[in-house]
A protein has these predicted regions:
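ATP-dependent adenylation/nucleotidyltransferase module used to activate substrates
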Residues: 1-143, 148, 178-186
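Short, structured secondary-structure boundary patches
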Residues: 48, 107-116, 149-154, 206-223
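Short C-terminal domain-edge/linker segments immediately following a structured domain
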Residues: 89-95, 121, 159-164, 200-204, ...
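A short, charged, Gly/Pro-tolerant segment at domain boundaries
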Residues: 220-232
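Catalytic subdomain that performs nucleotidyl-dependent activation
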Residues: 136-216
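Short, surface-exposed helix-loop/turn micro-motifs enriched in polar/charged residues
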Residues: 94-97, 131, 195-199, 221
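Residue-level detector of flexible, active-site-proximal loop/helix-junction positions
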Residues: 65-67, 95-97, 159, 175, ...
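Alpha-helical structural motif
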Residues: 4, 8, 73, 176, ...
């Protein structure tokens, strides 16, 4: 096992234990976008599902937005899941921009993706949805919320939903993006064919640069930021 794989596995296991993300009898649906993070989440949870305790069942769902002109390699995702012993569901969704012109395409797309995913999970007996956000995602969101909203908050490792009998879990919450990137390169994960043309990345990209600068100032900055939220 390569060093990056060992790091990712160790932090994945620690996150699952520290935040009680996996419990006996869980039926978990992975939101598979096709990016490196969700692919690695499929690989790790597939391995974890083969362990006797806690006994979990894992499947994945990939959502296609029919009215957004972007493309993912569906056959690759199907083959990847099959190789890992995971059943993949292909779901379709769309949205009508005219219903609320005040909302951006990205908001409407994300909202409808979540709704499609949640409803499928409930209707098919899943109790948890696993998302591929890693530690860097969570901390960049924290910095964005502090800077633009005045809110010391971010995505949680585990979050019960109010309107659905589901819990969102983020098993990669302690994993560093750099390690996932290295695993993806060494295991030859295939990237999406094309990204969404409407993706809003400027503000998040800017804050990612700020986060990198903080780590240059203090290599332990990520751990200080994490403690400020989750160990306060």
């Amino acid at each position: 096992m390569i060093k990056a794989e060992q790091k990712v596995l160790k932090r994945f296991n620690k996150g699952c234990v520290d935040y009680h993300l996996l419990e006996d009898g869980d039926r978990i649906l992975i939101a598979l976008s096709g990016g490196k993070d969700s692919l690695e989440l499929v690989r790790l949870l597939a391995q974890r599902a083969r362990i006797f305790k806690p006994h979990i069942e894992v499947e994945a769902a990939h959502i296609i937005m029919d009215n957004i002109p972007y493309e993912t390699d569906r056959s690759y995702l199907q083959d990847f899941c099959a190789e890992n012993g995971i059943r993949l569901h292909i779901l379709h969704s769309s949205f009508d921009e005219s219903t609320d012109p005040r909302k951006t395409r990205c908001f409407l797309c994300a909202w409808n993706r979540r709704k499609t995913l949640f409803e499928f999970a409930v209707n098919n007996g899943f109790n948890k949805i696993a998302l591929g956000h890693h530690m860097d995602d969570i901390l960049v969101t924290l910095l964005m919320n502090i800077t633009f909203e005045g809110s010391h908050s971010t995505m949680q490792p585990s979050l019960p939903l109010k309107h659905y009998p589901l819990t969102i879990v983020r098993p990669l919450c302690l994993v560093h993006e750099a390690d996932i990137r290295q695993v993806a390169e060494e295991l030859h994960f295939t990237k999406q064919k094309a990204l969404c043309p409407y993706e809003e990345t400027t503000r998040r990209s800017d804050m990612q640069a700020v986060f990198r600068q903080l780590e240059q100032l203090n290599p332990e900055a990520r751990y200080s930021l994490w403690r400020s939220v989750f160990m306060a």
